[in-house]
């Protein structure tokens, strides 16, 4: 599994992280993570093609004190092995809005409660082609 990290790229309320990539031909999983460190993750977007007992599942979670918390499972799975994808994460201070490739949106509470995050990392079976953090072009609660 590949691991890519970006440090000191500030993500504040009203900002959007756009991730463009291509999934491997036979992926198990790929995750997008925003937080303070690998032990303190505000939002963990985990695309599971076939991981443990999960098949075609979107899992959203957060990690506090190096312990995963209660996960949010989403039955939507607009991802295809071997294909390009774009996922956007919009930070709205109290929530994260995750824009999926098919235009649907998943919502997740900002459980850590911070006003900004400076650590973004990606893990798994995809090649990240481009990332950007900018003022959101989608509706936010700025």
Curated annotation (Swiss-Prot):
Gene3D superfamilies: 2.60.120.200. Skin; highest expression in that of individuals showing resistance to infectious disease. The keyword Disulfide bond does not apply. It comes from the Eukaryota. It is found in: Secreted. A beta-D-galactoside binds at residues 68-74. Its main location: secreted. GO terms for biological process: defense response to Gram-positive bacterium; induction of bacterial agglutination. Transmembrane segments: none annotated. GO terms for cellular component: extracellular region; extracellular space. One of its GO terms (molecular function) is carbohydrate binding. Keywords: Glycoprotein, Hemagglutinin, Lectin, Secreted. Residues 3-134 form the Galectin domain. The keyword Secreted applies. Glycans are attached at residue 130. Pfam families: Gal-bind_lectin. The N-terminus is blocked. Involved in host defense at the body surface. Causes agglutination of the Gram-positive bacterium S.difficile. Possesses calcium-independent hemagglutinating activity. Homodimer. Binds beta-galactoside inhibiting its haemagglutinating activity. This is Galactose-binding lectin l-1. It comes from Anguilla japonica (Japanese eel).
